[in-house]
């Protein structure tokens, strides 16, 4: 599925990749969201918008760690988004690729993403689309807040769990505690990757002229 959101229009759903050129004005701000498309269609679309072949190759791979690349003034990044969440930090991650150009944000993912859906349904979306970097920040910020919310909820659960184990702990309790620790380590590893990416994005845009609002959102992501 390919969704196209331009500043002055509602979402357009494209079933035929060949229609993209006639529907998208490349001179106007635009967000193209690609979900669960074939590799052939993804590659064809990205190349038609001038995305670097190395980045196209990476975005089609599965289970790569988060990364950031600067390709001739545009950026490419891989990110671990949130697909779904079950109780006690049982998070299903979704690999997401982003291409950011002057007037364009392209997002690629195989499954629905919390950050994408949050941005798509936000009343300020048309404002954000004017600046692709701002839209990217909003998507990442929604994911980060969801991560934080889930961790805080687990913190409360762990506090009660530790009190219980201190009184009487069973083998099942220890197994559950080990599972919690494993999930937290995985999240810590992903968070470290994401922090490095945000630092690289800040460095990239520090060399360019940004308005105060965009700078604020970048710094806010890092914090």
Question: How should these model regions be labeled?
Answer:
Residues 80-223:
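Extended amphipathic alpha-helical scaffolding segments in membrane-proximal extra-membrane regions
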